[in-house]
Amino acid sequence: GTGLVGSEMCIRDRNRPDWCLSRQRAWGIPIPVFVNKKTGEPLRDKIVIDRIVSSFKKGGSDAWFEIPASNYLEPEYDANDFEQIQDIADVWFDSGSTHAFVLEDRDDLKSPANLYLEGSDQHRGWFHSSLLESVGSRGVAPFEGILTHGFVLDDKGRKMSKSLGNTVNPQDILRDYGADILRLWVAGSDYYEDLRIGPEIIKHHTDHYRRLRNTLRYLLGSLNGFQENEKIDYSDMPQLEKWLLHRVNEVNNSVREKIEGYNFHSIYTEIHNFCTIELSSFYFEIRKDLLYCGEPNSLERRGCRTALDILFNHLTAWLAPILCFTAEEAWQCYINDKENSIHLKTIPISVNNWNDEALNIKWKRIRFIRSLVLAEIEEARNNNLIKSSLQAKVEIKLSKEDKDLFENLIAADIFITSEVSFSIEKLETPKIKIDNADGNKCSRCWKILPEVKPEGLCNRCEDVVKIYCS
């Protein structure tokens, strides 16, 4: 991580042995030095050095071996008085000087670099040599930060080798699963440690990818035909949508912060959990009835679709650096404009007006009560009392404080049941009873309500059908 620049690397450099720069090899970058045979001192003369530089510019570094020493030394010196060094520089000296001939010589790059990125073995290699050379010649580090990662191992934590037969060819993953699955594995791996890869690990990430893709599919389906004039102001939105935008803000702030810290593994985990736990298993489930069966131009439905539009714009921006092809595919399905790529957008700026921690705390408690209700519904289903949650009537005994949470909310929609009744008792944890709902099943929304005639519609669905038929 970047913290090593100020701590561990300083300790290592302080305790390091002297660095011998010369190597006796047949090929490499020469050390262009002449040594006085009598005194053993290297020649320091700007005229000679300028000749060497000019020669290298014309013929490359091989000119040191190809051009006679007299061409560099005379007439100021007698070439017979000097030994021409034939050693080459340590290869780490070559790579360590990239800050000078890569960053400083190009107008489209800046020096020092924002980040140096390499494996953990480079603390004694490239990072080390770059730091020494830049500090020694420029007085500053060549980078603002460094990021190191572990090595790729097989799924059992072993180094890959042909003899073990445990190598993984990225091309095979690209062929069988696609590039986004491989990118998801990279983003989902904690690079502070060694990274493991194998068939089961790729399958695990494929399952996660499918959940993320299904989230995008739900959003695209729910936003079909959405127009700009359908949007409503935040102040007019239902309470649940205001909670959703609060959470979008929280995740957005977290994603931006983690990007700055190169904490991609945590970004992936947070987005995945948000999509599966808070969206797919909670918000999407609750709003299916409103989206599928609600009055098309109602304020509640418009508020829901406005929030989903905001969510889609944020989610595709979050996913674009990781699932670049999937994010672009979803984006084009929504806007249908080849000139307007998701990769031309940036992570949105958070909207302070959406922050509402009190509302978030309230909905955390509602979600807890909902989890208790769903557990009882599941038990009733296992006992063959009901077949689906819409067949259920829920009776809840709870404290007045908990009951007040549901004021101005349709509790049956939150629990995805047909009927809910509350009774107040002094309880820390609500008590829940499940029974069969009274009435007949609406053939459109499938809720069981007393008002429904056999094979008929509930009052809400009758009104909506009239709107569509008018």
Question: Would you name each region that the model predicts?
Answer:
Residues S7-E8, R12-G225, L244-R287, L291, ...:
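Structured secondary-structure scaffolds
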Residues Q84-D87, V452-L457, Y468-S470:
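Short Cys/His-rich "knuckle" micro-motifs
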Residues I31, A437-N440, V452-K453:
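Flanking scaffold residues of small Cys/His-coordinated metal-binding clusters
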Residues I202-E228, P321-C333, K393-L427:
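Structured, non-catalytic alpha/beta "coupling" segments that mediate domain-domain communication
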